Every structure is written in C-alpha cells, then in structure tokens.
Design a protein with these regions (language model features):
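Anion-binding (especially nucleotide phosphate/pyrophosphate-binding) glycine-rich loop
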Residues: 35-70, 194-201
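A common structural junction motif
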Residues: 43-47, 175-187
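Short beta-strand-to-turn element immediately C-terminal to the catalytic PLP-Schiff-base lysine
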Residues: 24-27, 51-52, 158-162, 193-195, ...
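Short conserved micro-motifs on helix faces and helix-strand junctions that flank
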Residues: 16, 41, 71-72, 150, ...
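Short glycine/threonine-rich catalytic loop with a Thr-x-Gly-x-Asp
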Residues: 70-74, 212-226
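Catalytic strand-loop segment that frames the active site of acyl-thioester-processing enzymes
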Residues: 186, 198-210
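Acidic, low-complexity central loop/insert segments
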Residues: 58, 64-181, 197, 231-282
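N-terminal, positively charged, Ser/Thr/Ala/Gly-biased leader segments
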Residues: 1-18, 138
Length: 282
C-alpha cells in the first residue's frame, strides 16, 4: 500500500468558490492506468491530473475525466502549473508535458497562461447544421456560422451563435445525441459562443459517461480553440485580448483570459484558487 497527496484547486476562478474544480495528485508514480481512471471517477470532477516526473519538462501530466484519458486539456494545465510552482519553489515560468506535446506556461499578475501544444487544425463537421442546431434546442437561424471541428490540442466542435439569448436557451439534448459527432477520444462535446461581443460569453456541453449531458464551468482547451477560430474566421480580430465568461448557468462563474496574435500565437490564462489538500491510501 502507498500514500499519495493531492491538491484541490479552482481554476479560472475570480472568487474562492468559482471556476472549474480540479484535483492534482502529486508524485503519482506507482499508480496504474486503471487506478488513475478509477480515482478520476472517485473524485468525479471534470478532470483529475496525475503528476509524474519528466526529463523534458517540470512535470508530466496524465489527464483523466471520469470516463477517459485526455491528450490535453486547458484547466488541468493551468491548475497543474500552479500546483507544480507551489511544489518546486514558486516558479513563474515552467513547462508541462502531456500526451499532445509540451505546454509552456507563465504567470503574469496572478494569472497563469498557457500556449496550446499544437498548431490549429480546422475542419468541417459532417453533420448538417440544422440537425446539430436541433440537438441544441435551437433553430439553424440561431447559428452565426457553420459548426466546425477545431483542434489546438483537444479536438472539439465549435458553434458560433448570433445572440446571448440563443446561448442561454441552448442545451445538448441527450435524446438527440445519436447525430452528434465524436472526437478523436470518443467524446461528444460542443463549445458554444457569441463572437460579436467585446467580452465573449460561452458555454461547453458534454455527454456524461453513464448517460445524459452536463455543462463544464470553464474549458481552457476550448478557449484555445476559440482563439484559433477567431484567427481563421475573423482575422481582423487578431492581435486582441478578450475576457471569456463561462459557467454562470452551471453555478460556477469563470473568467478565461484569451490573447490572439496575428502571427498565430494563442494564449489562454486564468487565476487559480487553492481550495484544499489531502491524501489517500491504496
């Protein structure tokens, strides 16, 4: 039997009980893949990170949802950076490794920023837009553009909407999921946003492993994909910064700081609140 320590953090949090909760297991050597997956289900957060030693980076992240391992995810990267900094001597700049590649991070004015691990890929979605709108409880007229796949480390469907009213009405209907495309890791998700606002409002829905759908309060990888969407479809909006608000309807108000540069660089940032720590024995 062994003892492992963990930290509970709220990522993209502007208040102590806001943001997206994250569990970071420190020095996770000795845990099997099956144990990591079972522990992610035990903690039952949107993601749980297991930190391992790395020769290429300050630490290697294994990122698990309750149902699957992820190649990359944004709020685990931000939260892990804060946790690793705390463990390794208050670092202001570090690199984390994950299955998708290396993720550089730095802290500025209390905000941790990451750059996504790969160049953006944008491809069409094969499902008709009207069918996808119906699965969201919307009309095709509510869409501001055709849904697309965007991948800067985690492939997701992005759907731009015309109004905040449509955004507030939207919900991924579990009864209509059969039409929804799956990502490279078999997940059904969607990131909805209204692109015309000075401060972007967004929502992220996902299929739960055991049925039904849920809403994520803050999704850093999707925010990075949003940056790629803006670069591709709104090049005039390059070299800008946005606050992206997410999570209000989920009861966890969250703020993501998005920076988009005309030469292609994307940075996503957020504040991290340390909430609790503990240990478990296996």
């Amino acid at each position: 039997m062994g003892i492992w320590n963990y930290q509970l953090l709220n990522v993209f949090a502007e208040s102590p009980l806001g943001g997206n909760p994250l569990c970071v297991v420190e020095q996770a050597e000795g845990l099997s893949d099956a144990q990591m997956q079972a522990l992610a289900l035990q903690f039952n957060l949107s993601e749980t990170v297991f930190l391992l030693s790395s020769e290429q980076a300050n630490a290697h992240m294994r990122i698990f949802t309750p149902g699957a391992e992820m190649a990359f995810a944004g709020h685990p990267s931000i939260g892990s950076a804060a946790a690793v900094s705390r463990l390794q001597g208050d670092l202001q700049r570090l690199t984390l490794a994950c299955r998708a590649g290396l993720v550089p991070l730095d802290q500025q004015d209390g905000i941790w920023y990451f750059s996504p691990p790969k160049a953006a890929e944008i491809t069409p979605v094969s499902v008709p837009a009207a069918e996808m709108a119906a699965a969201l409880g919307l009309q095709e007229e509510d869409l501001a553009a055709a849904p697309v796949w965007v991948n800067t480390g985690s492939d997701q469907v992005l759907v731009a909407l015309k109004s905040t009213d449509a955004l507030q009405r939207a919900w991924l209907d579990a009864a209509k999921l059969a039409c929804w495309p799956r990502s490279s890791v078999g997940r059904r998700t969607v990131f909805l946003f209204v692109p015309d606002e000075a401060e972007i409002t967004a929502r992220y829905f996902f299929e739960r492993p055991n049925g039904g759908t849920g809403e994520d309060p803050a999704t850093g990888s999707a925010c990075a994909n949003l940056g790629a969407w803006l670069q591709h479809f709104r090049p005039a909006d390059s070299d800008r910064q946005w606050k992206v608000w997410q999570g209000a309807q989920a009861g966890r108000p969250s703020c993501l700081y998005l920076q988009v540069a005309p030469q292609g660089q994307i940075r996503v940032g957020g504040k991290v609140v340390f909430f609790a720590s503990g240990s478990f024995t296996l």
